[in-house]
Amino acid sequence: MASEAHAVVDAHSPPKTTTVWVTGGAGFIGSWLVMRLLERGYNVHATVRDPENQKKVKHLLELPKADTNLTLWKADLAVEGSFDEAIQGCQGVFHVATPMDFESKDPENEVIKPTVRGMLSIIESCAKANTVKRLVFTSSAGTLDVQEDQKLFYDETSWSDLDFIYAKKMTGWMYFVSKILAEKAAMEEARKNNIDFISIIPPLVVGPFITSTFPPSLITALSLITAHYGIIKQGQYVHLDDLCEAHIFLYEHPKAEGRFICSSHHAIIYDVAKMVRQKWPEYYVPTEFKGIDKDLALVSFSSKKLMDIKFQFKHTLEDMYKGAIETCRQKQLLPFSTRSTADNGKDKEAIPISTENYSSGKENAPVANCTGKFTNGEI
């Protein structure tokens, strides 16, 4: 296993009057970001699909300072101008939400175009408000490395191959396309409107969470335990808290511009499996993975640009899994042991995950690209 850094974030304090807007505020990434912003003293406008649905927003309303510093707004990426009201008075925007539907019969019109239109609609709303100085967009590692000839190193100059994606149409292809086109369109449109545009590119996001449902990115990360084997031959990882701290850091940093990869660790599946077996022996985790070479080369997503402006990651890969496992246990989304079935000599069966407790595929779903690696969607 390899890591980029382990330290603390040197964060800046925002002006007391700073108001920011977070799209997708009720989701896995969005809700943690809202929590950290409130802790910093920001006033937060968070848009969600249905502010009246207490089951979906309860975790936000219970956050410290939510009663004084948090306002929830109803908005829809597919509806032009639906963000105009929520953005009033905001100095910054964190665009986390994205439409996702891997089973769409018409991905071009149901996923790709709405994502791009939604991005441009947000920039238009920013321009109308005339108060927004910076927009931070949660992109995806799927914009970096989906290509026929895989490399061992990727940085912010890397872009996935659209022609290859359209030709192969691998699982999640419409998500990759939507993120690539939205990011590129936003760069140009933000420049025209004199808005600082920053995109932050996470790999698989793992860690504790405050949502009530099982984040699909953790279905991927914990597949070693649950036996929902979307096997990550080798993967790149970031702790949810590090990712959200990086969002705020980049928003506050006066010299931040352009794309930033936010990836702290990379590891092959055998190393991750060994760690989980050692730290959580109560779970049955395979020692062999058919068809996966133990000497598989590591692919690195470089966070050098982010660290060069003094951001430092503070969480280890073990921290990520500890936070995820403990939270899932607390919320009764994961059993405390899977040893009984395995110890009886039977093939391990997948742990049933209730659809009641599973965030829909439209929210933060893990996506396998053509090499068996995974990235995450965000909402």
UniProtKB/Swiss-Prot annotation:
Oxidoreductase listed as a keyword: yes
Entry's Gene Ontology molecular function annotations: dihydrokaempferol 4-reductase activity; flavanone 4-reductase activity
Reported tissue expression: Expressed in both leaf and hypocotyl tissues.
Pathway the protein acts in: Pigment biosynthesis; anthocyanin biosynthesis
Keywords: Flavonoid biosynthesis, NADP, Oxidoreductase
Gene3D superfamilies: NAD(P)-binding Rossmann-like Domain
Annotated binding of NADP(+), by residue: 56, 175
Disulfide pattern: none
Organism, scientific name: Solanum lycopersicum (Tomato)
Principal EC category: oxidoreductase
Function: Bifunctional enzyme involved in flavonoid metabolism.
EC number: 1.1.1.219, 1.1.1.234
InterPro entries, alphabetized: Epimerase_deHydtase, NAD(P)-bd_dom_sf, NAD(P)_dehydrat-like
Family note: Belongs to the NAD(P)-dependent epimerase/dehydratase family. Dihydroflavonol-4-reductase subfamily.
UniProt-recorded name of the protein: Dihydroflavonol 4-reductase
Catalysed reactions listed for this entry: a (2R,3S,4S)-leucoanthocyanidin + NADP(+) = a (2R,3R)-dihydroflavonol + NADPH + H(+); (2S)-flavan-4-ol + NADP(+) = (2S)-flavanone + NADPH + H(+)
An individual GO BP term: anthocyanin-containing compound biosynthetic process
Keyword Plastid among record annotations: no
